[in-house]
């Protein structure tokens, strides 16, 4: 998710160039680049979808140079977190009803990235054990 404005970080973060597109940590990468790199350790690059507002399409494509327009879930209006996650979930479900979704906000601080990756891998394994389909007829 990379659609918020980050108004608490004004004047660095603005509606035209919000915090996820800045190197807020002084690490040589913007927040969205760090998040994409972290998730790319878990998920093939082509399976990473970025939910953002239409106004940030060019910023995302400029900063995530290996990303294609097909990977962007462009929200026509900012409606906060829950609608963004629902939109992504519906998109994934329509492409793969058995797909597993990881929600990763682009502005989260992860202190121990190795532990974070291990925990996500464990969660993926748990989800794989839970996936099933049902042929049960409606009552």
Where are these regions (language model features)?
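Short, hydrophobic/glycine-enriched beta-strand segments
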Residues: 1-8
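Active-site beta-to-alpha loop of glycosyltransferases that engages the nucleotide-sugar donor
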Residues: 4, 27, 138
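Conserved small/polar residues in nucleotide/adenosyl-binding loops
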Residues: 132-139
């Amino acid at each position: 998710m990379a659609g918020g404005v980050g108004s608490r970080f004004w004047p660095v973060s603005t509606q035209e160039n919000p915090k996820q597109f800045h190197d807020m940590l002084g690490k040589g990468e913007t927040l969205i680049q760090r998040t994409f790199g972290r998730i790319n350790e878990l998920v093939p690059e082509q399976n990473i979808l970025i939910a953002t507002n239409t106004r940030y399409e060019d910023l995302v494509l400029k900063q995530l140079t290996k990303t294609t327009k097909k990977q962007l879930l462009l929200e026509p209006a900012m409606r906060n977190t829950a609608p963004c996650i629902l939109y992504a979930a519906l998109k994934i479900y329509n492409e793969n009803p058995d797909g597993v979704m990881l929600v990763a906000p682009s502005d989260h601080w992860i202190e121990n990235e190795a532990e974070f990756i291990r925990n996500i891998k464990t969660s993926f394994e748990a989800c794989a054990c839970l996936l099933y389909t049902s042929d049960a007829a409606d009552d």
